Amino acid sequence: LATGLATSGLLAWARRRPVLAGVLIGLGSAAKLYPLLFLYPLLLLGIRAGRLNALARTMAAAAATWLLVNLPVMLLFPRGWSEFFRLNTRRGDDMDSLYNVVKSFTGWRGFDPTLGFWEPPLVLNTVVTLLFVLCCAAIAYIALTAPHRPRVAQLTFLTVASFLLVNKVWSPQFSLWLVPLAVLALPHRRILLAWMTIDALVWVPRMYYLYGNPSRSLPEQWFTTTVLLRDIAVMVLCGLVVWQIYRPGRDLVRTGGPGALPACGGVDDPVGGV
């Protein structure tokens, strides 16, 4: 639901309907907070293009929609409403996270080895936050210094992928967040199918690892190895996206169509909206 609403928000933005884009992103964020990340690339591109009015309307519509959906539950059931935030603050590194991969292969006990029951992992939370801030700073540098303005889908993919890679939780369904963004950012079928295959294959050792029967289950390292391969595949996609940002002539979206960039012969950004 969140993925469909967020992607529809990008479609509305592409059709220059900023308020509708904000409403859809706000609805998506009410279902799952990650669509709020879409506003960051829009902010960067709005700054670069010098057109912040449309962005302001999108952000205002997103905030108002999110609040409109959440406020009744927030007022009637405040503890239940806040449980999502409490859970995410207190949970440790998930089995799909890079932090658990390191623990699996090295015996490292993590950033907060002496936590009591349900104590928040303060050091881990701080590390995750700092790493994501650094990623956002790098994305801002790319957005503002690339020879041609990056496409919305490219920066949005980099933002969401960075969030997943450094986050302490990567639930299996989170990979769906990347699918529409990857297709828009890097429309190369073989590359995308290779990545999707690797991601799908994580399911097999996961199930065998969780099977619970020592005679039939797999060692943890089989699972964490596939997680590492998946993360490396996502990093490769990010590298390819950055490479095409700085070499727009290699971008399939920007070559061979009307409305071309003078240097590329293709479309500037069909999802640009600015």
Describe each PLM feature range.
Residues 65-71, 160-168, 196-208:
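Aromatic-anchored segments of alpha-helical transmembrane domains
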Residues 1-7, 31:
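Multi-pass, polyprenyl lipid-linked donor-dependent membrane glycosyltransferases
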Residues 73-105, 217:
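Extracytoplasmic catalytic-loop and juxtamembrane helix elements of membrane-embedded
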Residues 6-20:
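Membrane-interface transmembrane helices that cradle and orient dolichyl/undecaprenyl
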